[in-house]
Amino acid sequence: MKLPHPLIVLASALLLTALPAHAQQLSGVGHDAETAQLHPKEDPLAPVYVVTATESFERGVKALASKKTVQRNSLGQSLVVASMPAWRLDELSHYMHETEGRCGGYFAFDSQAEAVAFIHNDQGARGTSTTFSDYPINQRRVVNALMPQVQETNIRGTISALSAYQNRYYASAHGQNAAVWIRNMWQGLAAGRSDVTAELFTACSNCSTQPSVILTIRGAELPNEIVVLGGHLDSIRSGASGDPNMLAPGADDDASGIATLTEILRIAMANGYRPKRTIKFMGYAAEEVGLRGSRAIAQSFRTQGQNVVGVLQLDMTNWKSPGSTAALNLISDFANAPLKQFIRDLFTTYMAPRGFTMTESACGYACSDHASWTALGYPAVMYDEGPIFPSLHTPNDRLDQMGGTADHSVPLAQLGVAFMVELGKTRNAKPTPPIEPRPNPGNPRPGH
């Protein structure tokens, strides 16, 4: 790999620390044609059909919903299709957070027929168990050169920029502008590389006016094999009832995930990294209202027959719970078993020797965007910060409530660099000898 010109590195650093006061002015220009396919804000009184776990429905969701039907997915899990007015989705998210101690918890659809079809066509059994690729660890020279380049200041700058928006709610102008700002920032990091493209994904019928963002690094040798690294770009405040001007900074949820992705991308671009496989960085729209953006993308990939060999979800990376000693937490449920083992092997190889530890826990049905890929039969995995940040979905989800730094995101970004390189591989690189994975150093802990 060639080293970047110093001016490119400087430009990248300046871009990462730009404030959205400037970025909003830039992002609001010239994207009307790109977002014209998106639908306007939904009617708050219109019915929305949610798919959630039967146990969640019986514990409390039923108080918010009216009609219901019970179905089973390919994993044999009992699921409920229930209807409620759109404005009650905020209450549903609040229930999941406050009562079940987690995020997400449901998929959302415009019609009952869509919701039922989603369950009938579920491929979660395939997504969780099938080995889609060999996952050898043989890129140590490249990974060890790139991992130390993760900079806390860059991650902090992106968190600050995104959380300075009034909100990134999917049905607000702020949410659309934030998405365009991310696309422009990622595009700027590519510095005109011909094998890199950045686009707004607008083929989502229920994402309101918020697009998702996809940056693609075309694989040099295996372009039809795709690696995805993603996180959601929207934010929400509990109890706001869909107010487009709600105060929802979402610094941890999930500006931190987008910032961590951005730092991984910056390092790849600054070092001229060229993968064998195609790598896609994704910022998903409308995660907070039923995993809408990621489901639309995963569905489009399935319809097109795209070959995805691995998906990594980064959702909340920057809160370190008092008393916690682990660097990160691997999500154990609704994820691909071979890919989870790959994460364990990566951690053992690259993170444990640096003194880090990892926990594992379940997060429940549809807790984040990896669940969209799993349900469509793709191999997906997620790791996060660990115990849940108590200020999620409130105006206090701010960087200063997390110590004012992005220190906790650094090891998650470093592991993300390893995931990108070891799964994407490196063009024309002589692989290092594969290693025998050592036992997982983590200590599994109860779910949160």
Residue ranges and their predicted role:
Residues 157-218:
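A non-catalytic alpha/beta surface segment that caps or lines the substrate-entry region
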Residues 320-436:
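Active-site-adjacent substrate-binding region
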Residues 155-163, 199-200, 212-216, 226-231, ...:
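Structural recognition of the beta-strand scaffold that forms the well-ordered cores
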Residues 209-212, 245-338, 342, 365-366:
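Acidic/histidine-rich catalytic neighborhood of metal-dependent amide-processing enzymes
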